[in-house]
Amino acid sequence: MYRYFLKLEKHTLVMLEEELEFVSKYCDLLRERFGESFVTDIDIPDKYHGARIIPCTLQVMVENAVKHNVVNSSSALHISIGVGMRHIVVRNNLNPKKTEPEVSTGTGLQNISRQYEILFNRRVVTGKTASEFIVRIHLIL
């Protein structure tokens, strides 16, 4: 994973395929930490693997879900990553932490959103239902 970060220093965009490999490894680490309480479903058809994405976008989305939700044996966190209408769609069930939210460092969802607006004049769209949080990120084809 560290090699991926070092490689990113020179790149504004990476292939979606590389990003998916990275987020899969990151999710493997989280599964070691949380066990069966951390569930992921990554379903991106091969035809999208050549699209481009800002580095670490998916890792930030997963990290955001873990940061804001309870993950334990009585409350599993389910995260799905898929494609819909030229967007990557990241969804997670909601089970918000009851404690005060951590102070934002500006390196998470807000930072990714700013990068997409500045570089591509595209918005990262977020939404929430009673049961899930959804993020839509425009694919750079």
List PLM regions with ranges.
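Two-component histidine phosphotransfer core
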Residues: 1-138
